A protein has these predicted regions:
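Single, functionally critical "micro-switch" positions that shape active/binding sites
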Residues: 10, 133-135, 220
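Internal alpha/beta core interface subdomains
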Residues: 78, 82-215
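Basic, polar low-complexity surface loops/patches
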Residues: 1-100, 104-106, 112
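Conserved small/polar residues in nucleotide/adenosyl-binding loops
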Residues: 216-223
């Protein structure tokens, strides 16, 4: 059985609370899009958990959580979020958390752009109240094919990935210098950042598109519940 929860407003509809209630009876909980610009608070096991990227299904034992293809993922935020809930006794391993190799990475410059543009707009009273998490800019670059996907972290030593990273950085430096008079970012620093994130998250990165199919096949004799 597949259960879908979606919002019809601009957030704050209570999706997180509904998902937390439904997750108790789910086998797999999938977050298919979005980033860490908003979050939800869940009270479980007499503790408060504030989640921005992880589905609240992560708080339930035997529930597998998936961050899907449509996500834009702030890698540092995700690593910190995992560490924070582990400190409260929640088990997070590659067995119960799967990251789509096709999900988009929120690059360091996305938050920089968001901050600079919001500051520029504020001077004329036109600021729109961005969370400054870089979500819109990550999605924009996704559709412009000017960012990396999580799966690229597994191939950082390949020349094709490094060349793409260099081209992306060159274009972004021109954009930031021309629009906001920013100093250029260096390629070695950017590559080191990518390598550090890969070292933390590589065990979780899989082909989640194929995963539900194989999971269903393995449990063909049961009724799987997907949320």
């Amino acid at each position: 059985m597949l259960t879908a929860v979606t919002g019809i407003n601009w957030g704050d509809e209570g999706k997180g609370r509904v998902i937390d209630l439904l997750a108790e009876n789910a086998d797999v909980v999938v977050r298919y899009q979005g980033g860490n610009n908003a979050g939800h608070t869940v009270v479980a096991k007499q503790q408060k958990f504030v989640l921005h990227l992880l589905p609240s299904g992560i708080l339930h034992e035997n529930v597998i959580c998936v961050l899907g293809d449509g996500m834009v993922v702030d890698l540092e935020h995700l690593t910190n979020e995992i560490a924070q809930i582990r400190e409260k006794g929640v088990v997070v391993t590659p067995n119960n958390l799967k990251l789509s190799k096709r999900a988009t990475i929120s690059m360091p410059w996305h938050k920089i752009q968001d901050e600079l543009e919001e500051t520029r707009l504020a001077k004329t009273g036109a600021a729109f109240g961005s969370t400054k998490r870089g979500i819109a800019y990550a999605y924009s670059d996704k559709y412009r094919k000017k960012t990396l996907r999580l799966g690229d972290l597994l191939h950082l030593k390949e020349e094709s990935v490094q060349n793409r990273l260099k081209m992306m950085l060159e274009a972004k430096n021109l954009e930031l210098a021309g629009c906001y008079y920013q100093e250029p970012m260096s390629y070695p620093a950017l590559l080191s950042w990518c390598e550090a994130q890969a070292a933390e998250l590589w065990p979780y990165i899989v082909d989640t598109g194929a995963y539900p199919v194989s999971y269903t096949h393995l449990r063909a004799h049961e009724t799987g519940a997907y949320l």
